Structure formats: C-alpha cells, structure tokens
C-alpha cells in the first residue's frame, strides 16, 4: 500500500500530455492534427479514466485502513526559509479526485458529439484536459502555495472555457466578468495566505493547523488580525463557489458550451471553494466568528439563489441559480461544523447537477433544429414544452435529476440535504426555517423548469416567426397570467443580457458563434424555412453519459445512509471520512435510528411535495392550456386584499427576473464608479500633468521665438545689446556699492 501512495504524485499530470500534444500538433502539423482530431477525444477519456481507476483504488485502501499519506519535497533557500512542495492523499482528496474524474469522463464523452460541428473542437478538448489537470493538482496540494497556484490555473481555465466562443461579444464579456469577480476573491485569498504564514511561519497544512491551535490555546495571537486573515481566506472561497455577494459571475458563465456548464457546476470551479473551506476547517473552527460568518453567507446564498431561480426563462440560468442555492447548503453545513453532511451533499449534488446540465444540453441541441443556433431562443423555456414525446430518454433522466434536487427519496440528494436540514435545527431555528422553506422553493422552481420544458405543447409553434406572440392558445406564466409586468425602476435590467464590466456597448448575439454542418435558421429573425417541425432525440454518444449519471443519481446516495445497527455498517461515507471526522469531532457519532430518521424525512418530503404541487398547479397543461389564464382571474373579485396580493407577487417576480437588482447595482455604482474614476484620471493626466509639461515647452518656444525676432539675426545688433546690458549692470553696481 505504501508503494501505491508513493506514485500518487503523478495524478495531476496524467491528463497533461493532451493539451501539450494538441498545442504542439497544431503548431507543427496543423492539417494532420485536425484530420485525426477525434483521436484526441479518445486520448482525453483514456488518460482521465486511468486517473479515475487510480483514485478509486486509493479510496478503497483508505476506507479499509483509515490512512492519510503526505509526501513533501523541501527546497531550502537559506537557513531561515525553505519552500516545500508535496502531495496529500486523505479522504477529502480521494473524494474530490473521484468526482472530478467520473464527471469529467462523462462530460468528455458527451462533448465528442456536442462539439463535433465546432471549429474549435481541438481547442475545447485541450482546455478541458488542462482544466482536469488544474483541479486534480488543487485537491492533491499539501500546502497553501500549491493551492494558490492551481487555484489560479482553475480560474484561467474557466476564463478560457466560458469565453470559448469569444467572437460572440456576450461570451467575451461573460468570461471577463467571471475573471474580474474572481480576482476580488483571489486577492483576498493571497493576503490571507500571507497573513497566516506571518502568524505560523508555515504553509504546510499539518504544521499550520498544529502551530495555530497551540497559539490559540496559549492565547499568543491577536484575535482581530487572525479573524481578518481568516475572512480574507474565506473571500477566495466565496468568489469561487459563487456565494453572496460575489455570485454575479455564475449565471453569465452559461455563455460557454453546455458541457462546460456541467463541469463547472458539478466537479470543478464551484466545488473548489467548498473544497477550500473543507480543507481549512480545522483552522476556521477555532475562530467562532468565522464559523458563524460562513453559516450566515451560506444561508443567505441558499435563499437568494432559490428566489432568483423562480422566474428565469433561460433553462441554463435557472440551473445555475439552483447550483448557487445548493452550494449555499454546503457552505451552511460547513459553517455549522457538519463536515460529513457538506461533503455528502457535494457528492450527490455533483452527479445530479451534471445530469441536469447534460440533459439541458440535449434539449438545446434538439431545439436548434427548429430555431437555429441562437442561445436566446434555443435555451428559452418559453419556446419549449411538449418535449416528452420527442426526447423521451432525456425526459426520464432529467426527471430523475429534478426529483433528486427536490429531495424525493430514494434519490441521491434526498439523503444529503435531509442531513443538512436536520443539523440546522440544532444550530439555529431561524436558519432552519429558512433552509426548510428554501427546500420547498427548490422543489417549486425545479419542477417549473421540468414542466415548462417537457409538458404541454411545443410553444414555438404558437409564435409568429418575427418572435411576436399570436393570439395565445397555450399560455404559461409564473403567476398565472399572460405577459410580464414591466418594471420602470431605474435599476431594472434585461435578464437575457449579461452585465458588461469592461464595455459600454451591448451587442446582439453573433450569428457566427458556431459552424454547423446542417442548415439552420438565421438568428436575427425566425424564418419560415424550418429544418424540422419538431425536435429529435440526441445521438447515443450524448445519451450514454446522461444514462450513466442517471444511475449515479439513483444509487450514489446509498454510500452515506447513516444507519449502523446490529453489526451492519451501511454508512460507507463515515468510514471513508473517519480520519478527518476524528480530527474535527473526536467523539462524534453519525449513526441514526430509523424512527428518528423517518420522523424528520416525512417533514422534508412533505415540504418538497408541496412545492411540486404548487408548480404543477401553475404549469401543468390541464391548468395552463386555456386561451388565457386571465379568463379564470376575471371570475375572482379583485378586492383590496387581492390587489395587494398581486402587487406582492409582481414584486417577487421583478426581484427574481431582474436578479435582485444586484447586477444592476454593481454595474451602476461599482463599474460606473470605477469607469468615472478612470475618466477623471485620464482627464487629469491629459489636461493637468501633460498640460504642465507641455506648457513649459510651449512657453520656452514662445520666448525663444520672441528673442529671435527682436535680434533680427545681425551680429552688430547682438554686440550693441550686449554692451548695453553690461553698461547698465556696471552703472547699477556703481550706484549701489560706491558709497
């Protein structure tokens, strides 16, 4: 076993040859490399599969022996400073490695077909493999310096992949927004790392935790400074995991290809923030204010993400806000000290959300046969509906993922979310009420997405091809009426557009974003020359990963069932995490009896079913297929209470549709303020600084020209003036000093 761990350092570097060879091939042999481009997809899947097998083998050994392995190479620079590099294999590392590789393999297989018609096929697989390398390097790092290096590489890869179709200005601005927002958190992370090195003198996790705990125990640290450094460390996780208030980049990250959305939201970028907090939890737990801050940020994000998902029309943006809310649950669990529950939900959510995103990609792919390549139309749930008849396999798997996120047993997220909800009652009743209420909202907005997409009729057939509504035959709206109430508020923004950080101009979607081999409609307007009247199911290479992730969604929750009775240990996850749990909670007991579990589960499942019922009432075709739901409303007497209720609903709708006005607030005050400051400094530089230097030159030029014209160019005149000046000088000298 020791020999196996010795070779674990190679894990991050196994996928690295793919981007290196693709880059070299495109430079040296571009034609041959492009001709055999699908070979690189096979190589990417093969190398990542090797990492997966190695990670599973290490995980089995850890479950059986509860071991942790760390190896460090020390580079001694001088007697006072040495730089250490190494790798750490513990339960957290093995869990993250399996998540990254399993989800990554499914995404790569899926992408082979999804990106088959794209000219950037090779570039896409190069980025994906480098993304896997960066994330694997991050989770195997044994110190904060390595964490930061791979942390920045993960951010770089996400920037490249979100802006993969960089010719579309919307995508270019989205990747810039993600990059700039994450720079805020990364700067805090760097300052926090330097602060804790100044306190402890070490970057290594094991030494850092031991030294810091001793300093806290002996009361030898400045608690204000320690708290500040911990907040700065946490800021990096807030930005990476899209927690409030640095969450604004996440929905705009949907401008990248859909497989990237699946990878970012399941196993890579957003998981990095949760991983960092979990890795540093032994540090944070001895600082009570930080643990409370983590839980507060988590519960705010839980509720905010759920409310923002309520009125989204873009299917990927709706799932993005769902990810934000679920990450809030994980952060809440970590803030409460529920280490096991947080990692359990990280595992179950990763597979469920990857399933949903790949399913949405299959839906978008099928919608493009009708509306052409236009994300504003192919991702618009208002143009979908009735797809259950056309994409039945996608429908079944998407329903599995939806039910899992809703918390319906026996699917994966039911087991993990229920643990977090139960732990929240012990931590804070207020937090518990918010968390349980948000569970109902989750069921509502997830079934809203499902019903708008798969039930009813294909809504695109009930629209004019100029994009305007016909007389509504099939009308669905969030609040049971046709149309959207427009808000004239100063901060209202168009939800179909990104918030532009670095550009004043807002551009339409570029028509040349992706080259397709089959014909498609123009993007500016619908045309009557449709390729196909109805969507069709995706190819097998796209359905296979969806099917596998569906199996994970069905069965992965079984690893964390917390029932240990009569010598039967069903809780594999607790045994797997035993070294970490014993470090954090030496006397913890994760077992639970059936009666207690069923009592808690009945409440959570009832709340989930209530949310599903409300969504079904508003969006099920039996209620929404009338010509206009206002027909029903006309029979209801609109008294003062009803008018007030409508105002409340419209306010919630505007809040959700306009992203809680947070993006608009940042754009107006932060971006506008920075741009105003830049314009002022530009004016000051041009008019004042340059004016002073240029003014001296102009004055010198004018004086010189004046003297030149006075002299006239004659030597006799120069001699006359010279003698006159000397005479005047001598006369003045005589008058002043003669006495």
From Swiss-Prot:
Q: Which reaction does it catalyse?
A: a plastoquinone + NADH + (n+1) H(+)(in) = a plastoquinol + NAD(+) + n H(+)(out); a plastoquinone + NADPH + (n+1) H(+)(in) = a plastoquinol + NADP(+) + n H(+)(out)
Domain of life of the native organism: Eukaryota
Under Gene3D superfamilies, the record lists: 1.20.5.2700
Q: What is its main location?
A: plastid
Cellular localisation: Plastid, Chloroplast thylakoid membrane
Transmembrane parts of this sequence: 9-29, 40-60, 89-109, 125-145, 147-167, 185-205, 219-239, 258-278, 286-306, 327-347, 354-374, 396-416, 425-445, 543-563, 602-622, 717-737
Q: Could you describe the subunit structure of this protein?
A: NDH is composed of at least 16 different subunits, 5 of which are encoded in the nucleus.
Q: What is this protein called?
A: NAD(P)H-quinone oxidoreductase subunit 5, chloroplastic
Please name the taxonomic classification of the source: Eukaryota, Viridiplantae, Streptophyta, Embryophyta, Tracheophyta
């Amino acid at each position: 076993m020791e020999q196996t761990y010795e070779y674990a350092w190679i894990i991050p570097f196994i996928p690295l040859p793919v981007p290196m060879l693709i880059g070299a091939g495109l430079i040296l042999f571009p034609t041959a490399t492009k001709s055999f481009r699908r070979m690189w997809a096979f190589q990417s899947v093969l190398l990542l599969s090797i990492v997966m097998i190695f990670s599973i083998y290490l995980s089995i050994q850890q479950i059986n022996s509860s071991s942790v392995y760390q190896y460090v190479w020390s580079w001694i620079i001088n007697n006072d400073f040495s730089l250490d590099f190494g790798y750490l294999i513990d339960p957290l590392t093995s869990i993250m490695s399996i998540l990254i590789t399993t989800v990554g393999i499914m995404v790569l297989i899926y992408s082979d077909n999804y990106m088959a018609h794209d000219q950037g096929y090779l570039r896409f697989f190069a980025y994906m493999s480098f993304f896997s390398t960066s994330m694997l390097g991050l989770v195997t790092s044994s110190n904060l310096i390595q964490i930061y290096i791979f942390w920045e590489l993960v951010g770089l890869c996400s920037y490249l992949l979100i802006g993969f179709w960089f010719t579309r200005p919307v995508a270019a601005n989205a990747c810039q927004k993600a990059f700039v927002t994450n720079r805020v958190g990364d700067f805090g992370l760097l300052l926090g790392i330097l602060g804790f090195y100044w306190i402890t003198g070490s970057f290594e996790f094991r030494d850092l935790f031991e030294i810091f705990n001793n300093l806290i125990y002996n009361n030898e640290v400045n608690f204000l400074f320690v708290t500040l450094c911990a907040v700065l460390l946490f800021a990096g996780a807030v930005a990476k995991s899209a927690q409030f208030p640095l969450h604004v980049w996440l929905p705009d990250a949907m401008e990248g290809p859909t497989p990237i959305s699946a990878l970012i939201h399941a196993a890579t970028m957003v998981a990095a923030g949760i991983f960092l907090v979990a890795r540093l939890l032994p540090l944070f737990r001895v600082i009570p204010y930080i643990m409370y801050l983590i839980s507060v940020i988590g519960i705010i994000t839980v509720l905010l993400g759920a409310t923002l998902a309520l009125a989204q029309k873009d299917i990927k943006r709706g799932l993005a806000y769902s990810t934000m809310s679920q990450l809030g649950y994980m952060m809440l669990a970590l803030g409460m000290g529920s280490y096991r529950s947080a990692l359990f939900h990280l595992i179950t959510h990763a597979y469920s959300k990857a399933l949903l995103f790949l399913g949405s990609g299959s839906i978008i792919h099928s919608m493009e046969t009708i509306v052409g390549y236009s994300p504003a139309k192919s991702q618009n749930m208002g143009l979908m509906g009735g797809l259950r008849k056309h994409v039945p396999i996608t429908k079944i798997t998407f329903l599995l993922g939806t039910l899992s996120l809703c918390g319906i047993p026996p699917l994966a997220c039911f087991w993990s979310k229920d643990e977090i909800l139960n732990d929240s009652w012990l931590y804070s009743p207020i937090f518990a009420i918010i968390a349980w209420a948000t569970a109902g909202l989750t069921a509502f907005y997830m079934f809203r997405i499902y019903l708008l997409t798969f039930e009813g009729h294909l809504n695109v057939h009930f629209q004019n091809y100029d994009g305007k509504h016909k007389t509504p035959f099939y009308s669905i709206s969030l609040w049971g009426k046709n149309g959207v109430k427009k808000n004239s508020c100063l901060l209202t923004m168009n939800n179909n557009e990104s918030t532009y950080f670095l550009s004043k101009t807002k551009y339409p979607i570029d028509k040349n974003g992706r080259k397709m081999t089959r014909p498609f409609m123009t993007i500016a307007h619908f045309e009557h020359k449709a390729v196909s009247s109805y969507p069709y199911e995706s190819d097998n290479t796209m359905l296979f990963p969806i099917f596998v992730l569906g199996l994970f969604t069905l069965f992965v929750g079984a690893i964390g069932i917390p029932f240990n009775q009569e010598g039967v240990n069903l809780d594999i996850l607790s045994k797997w995490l035993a070294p970490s749990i014993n470090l954090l909670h030496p006397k913890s007991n994760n077992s639970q009896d059936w009666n207690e579990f069923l009592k808690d589960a009945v409440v959570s499942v009832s709340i989930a079913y209530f949310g599903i019922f409300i969504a079904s009432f508003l969006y099920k075709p039996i209620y929404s297929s009338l010509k206009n739901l206002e027909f029903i409303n006309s029979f209801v007497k609109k008294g003062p209470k009803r008018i007030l209720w409508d105002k409340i609903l419209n306010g919630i709708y505007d809040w959700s549709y306009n992203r809680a006005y947070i993006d608009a607030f940042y754009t107006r005050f932060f971006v506008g303020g920075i741009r105003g400051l830049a314009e002022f400094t530009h004016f000051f530089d041009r008019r004042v600084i340059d004016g002073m230097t240029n003014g001296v030159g102009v004055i010198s030029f004018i004086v010189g020209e004046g003297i030149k014209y006075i002299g006239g160019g004659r030597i006799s005149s120069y001699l006359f003036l010279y003698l006159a000046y000397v005479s005047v000088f001598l006369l003045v000298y005589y008058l002043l000093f003669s006495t």
